[in-house]
Amino acid sequence: MPGCRISACGPGAQEGTAEQRSPPPPWDPMPSSQPPPPTPTLTPTPTPGQSPPLPDAAGASAGAAEDQELQRWRQGASGIAGLAGPGGGSGAAAGAGGRALELAEARRRLLEVEGRRRLVSELESRVLQLHRVFLAAELRLAHRAESLSRLSGGVAQAELYLAAHGSRLKKGPRRGRRGRPPALLASALGLGGCVPWGAGRLRRGHGPEPDSPFRRSPPRGPASPQR
């Protein structure tokens, strides 16, 4: 090659470089149980042409790093708060909904208990009314039984009286007077009941007979006065 030395670019130099290139080490598929060696930290070495960093610049770079870390921490905290905020709101809403459901259930149970209490009070009032009706019916039955017992006692006394005086009562109407004849029979027997002077005969009383122009003359006898 132009511009190069023969010793550097010749075949001898190429053979040297070929000899310097060694084959790569064989790859071990099994991992070693020992931990890997720590990676060495590279510290920038100042070159002879560069001057060493000043302490003010180092403090400024450290403050900038701290500011960046603080900003990252604030961003992470705000993200966590933003993630936890909706969850907390949903939890509060769920708690409020659960309380509302519990209150509605308690109100429904209270209404059911109140309805049952009213029903029980109505049933008790009806039972009391029926009890009063039954008492009134029992009193009526007692009065009727008493009246029936009195009637039965009267009937028994009447039967005893009839049994004791039945023969006399049967003989009594035969010995008594005959009944008053009716008006037609009286008129057929002489019209004694139609004339005013004949009414006294049909009367039961013993009052004086009325005056009659056709009065019969008394029978003549030794005691009767002569005309």
Curated annotation (Swiss-Prot):
Transmembrane segments: none annotated. One of its GO terms (biological process) is regulation of cell population proliferation. InterPro entries: TRNP1 (IPR040266). GO terms for cellular component: euchromatin; nucleus. Ubiquitinated, leading to its degradation by the proteasome. GO terms for molecular function: DNA binding. Keywords: Cell cycle, Developmental protein, DNA-binding, Neurogenesis, Nucleus, Transcription, Transcription regulation, Ubl conjugation. The keyword Nucleus applies. It comes from the Eukaryota. It is found in: Nucleus. Residues 1-72, 200-227 are annotated as: Disordered. Residues 22-55 have a biased composition (Pro residues). DNA-binding factor that regulates the expression of a subset of genes and plays a key role in tangential, radial, and lateral expansion of the brain neocortex. Regulates neural stem cells proliferation and the production of intermediate neural progenitors and basal radial glial cells affecting the process of cerebral cortex gyrification. May control the proliferation rate of cells by regulating their progression through key cell-cycle transition points. Interacts with TMF1; may regulate TRNP1 proteasomal degradation. This is TMF-regulated nuclear protein 1. It comes from Homo sapiens (Human). The gene is TRNP1.
